[in-house]
């Protein structure tokens, strides 16, 4: 316990009584964040049920997918409660190198013949009994944790030397290359943007940031132009109704769903497009089903909930930064940017603003790996809030004690 407190508060000394009092209290949860997360979780299960019942009939149970999704929620919540919330961020930072190695190995192993499982031409899954694990989800969280640890241990170097971004640049390039070999362009874009955003928020040298961004941009353009299907995606998303039964089929049906939803929607469970017209209605395109059933009002409410999560994430990051909890602040930045960016991209794809990326809507779309990782990530965010609040309380306790000691000494002098 003392070692943990020392890692959390290397600059602060507090009485053993104060430390024990604060440590024995329950985890300090952000109430607004908790409400937003629980609301999205409950809403997501309802929408998965609505969007997948027709497809579930093919497996002999209309609730086939929501049952599996509920199991993923239970697993993710259990890991969060019994592991993530109970361990200090300093512990994860201490093992950041091993987390980095494990993350890159996951991205490499999935490419090996006989290990990785291919779906629609993409090697993104590793079979594990009756389920398939999407390794990029876990690797992304691992890389965000590593980046947070790197920022915490190299803050001065990042802020004052151009070479400060060299290590992260190499890691981002290696991870992006492995992801593109799957291929998974959407996750590559989100991961690279998230890690760069973390460095930028930590005030990294802009010259290296610009250089790394240009290199990644050139690589991205090359990857897009190297495959005919990616070029066709770019062309079809700009006008899906030019080929509504070919490359534009999925987006055309998504736009029909969103358009027919209007302001108030058709009503929960009343979507027409989910009835085998819209592919991936319960996964990547669940937003279109939501817009059709709940209309513009539902869309605004959904955006509002994601906005609350991102806002609270940055508030928590600011709390941690002020209390000199650099790793916690960086981790909160990364998780907030990732969730907000992925939600915006998914909604943009559904509305035809962006080309199809194959990204799920966090906490809403069907997907066990994505759900488990999202809950674990939000658990880290809550842990950062707890530690920042704990440090603030210890600091205030120390200030109060100093004031009391000063008052006692003053009285003794006057007497």
UniProtKB/Swiss-Prot annotation:
Keywords: Cell cycle, Cell division, Cell inner membrane, Cell membrane, Cell shape, Cell wall biogenesis/degradation, Glycosyltransferase, Membrane, Peptidoglycan synthesis, Transferase, Transmembrane, Transmembrane helix. PROSITE patterns: FTSW_RODA_SPOVE (PS00428). It catalyses: [GlcNAc-(1->4)-Mur2Ac(oyl-L-Ala-gamma-D-Glu-L-Lys-D-Ala-D-Ala)](n)-di-trans,octa-cis-undecaprenyl diphosphate + beta-D-GlcNAc-(1->4)-Mur2Ac(oyl-L-Ala-gamma-D-Glu-L-Lys-D-Ala-D-Ala)-di-trans,octa-cis-undecaprenyl diphosphate = [GlcNAc-(1->4)-Mur2Ac(oyl-L-Ala-gamma-D-Glu-L-Lys-D-Ala-D-Ala)](n+1)-di-trans,octa-cis-undecaprenyl diphosphate + di-trans,octa-cis-undecaprenyl diphosphate + H(+). The chain crosses the membrane at residues 31-51, 63-83, 97-117, 133-153, 162-182, 185-205, 206-226, 245-265, 285-305, 326-346, 361-381. Its EC number is 2.4.99.28. GO terms for molecular function: lipid-linked peptidoglycan transporter activity; peptidoglycan glycosyltransferase activity. Pathway: Cell wall biogenesis; peptidoglycan biosynthesis. The keyword Cell wall biogenesis/degradation applies. The keyword Cell wall biogenesis/degradation applies. It comes from the Bacteria. It is found in: Cell inner membrane. GO terms for cellular component: cell division site; plasma membrane. GO terms for biological process: cell wall organization; FtsZ-dependent cytokinesis; peptidoglycan biosynthetic process; regulation of cell shape. It is a multi-pass membrane protein. It is an enzyme of class 2 (transferase). NCBIfam families: ftsW. Belongs to the SEDS family. FtsW subfamily. Peptidoglycan polymerase that is essential for cell division. This is Probable peptidoglycan glycosyltransferase FtsW. The lineage of its organism: Bacteria, Pseudomonadati, Pseudomonadota, Gammaproteobacteria, Chromatiales.
């Amino acid at each position: 316990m003392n070692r943990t407190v020392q890692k959390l508060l290397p600059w602060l000394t507090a009485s053993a009584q104060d430390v024990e009092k604060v440590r024995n209290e329950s985890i300090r949860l952000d109430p607004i964040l908790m409400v937003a997360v629980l609301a999205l979780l409950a809403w997501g299960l309802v929408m998965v049920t609505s969007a997948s019942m027709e497809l579930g009939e093919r497996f002999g149970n209309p609730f086939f997918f929501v049952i599996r999704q509920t199991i993923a929620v239970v697993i993710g919540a259990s890991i969060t409660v019994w592991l993530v919330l109970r361990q200090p961020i300093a512990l994860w930072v201490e093992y950041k190198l091993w987390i980095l190695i494990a993350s890159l190995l996951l991205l490499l192993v999935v490419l090996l013949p006989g290990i990785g499982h291919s779906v629609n031409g993409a090697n993104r899954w590793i079979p594990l009994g009756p389920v398939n694990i999407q390794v990029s989800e876990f690797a992304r969280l691992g890389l965000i944790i590593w980046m947070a640890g790197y920022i915490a241990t190299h803050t001065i170097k990042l802020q004052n030397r151009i070479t400060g971004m060299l290590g992260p640049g190499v890691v981002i390039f290696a991870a992006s290359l492995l992801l593109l070999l799957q291929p998974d362009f959407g996750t590559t874009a989100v991961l690279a943007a998230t890690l760069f955003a973390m460095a930028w928020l930590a005030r990294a040298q802009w010259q290296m940031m610009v250089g790394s961004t240009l290199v990644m941009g050139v690589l991205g353009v090359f990857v897009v132009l190297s495959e005919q299907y990616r070029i066709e995606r770019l062309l079809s998303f700009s006008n899906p109704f030019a080929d509504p039964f070919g490359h534009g089929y999925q987006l055309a049906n998504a736009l029909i769903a969103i358009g027919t939803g209007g302001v108030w929607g058709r009503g929960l469970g009343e979507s027409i497009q989910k009835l085998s017209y819209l592919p991936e209605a319960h996964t990547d395109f669940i937003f279109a089903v939501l817009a059709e059933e709940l209309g513009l009002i539902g869309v605004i409410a959904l955006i509002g909930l994601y906005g609350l999560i991102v806002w609270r994430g940055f508030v928590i990051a600011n709390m941690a930064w002020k209390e000199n909890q650099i790793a916690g602040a960086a981790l909160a930045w990364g998780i907030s940017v990732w969730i907000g960016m992925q939600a915006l991209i998914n909604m943009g794809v559904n509305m035809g603003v962006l080309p199809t990326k194959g990204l799920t809507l966090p906490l809403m779309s069907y997907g066990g790996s994505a759900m488990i990782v999202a809950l674990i990530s939000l658990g880290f965010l809550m842990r950062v809030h707890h530690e920042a609040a704990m440090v603030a309380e210890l600091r205030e306790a120390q200030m109060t004690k100093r004031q009391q000691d000063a008052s006692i000494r003053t009285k003794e002098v006057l007497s």
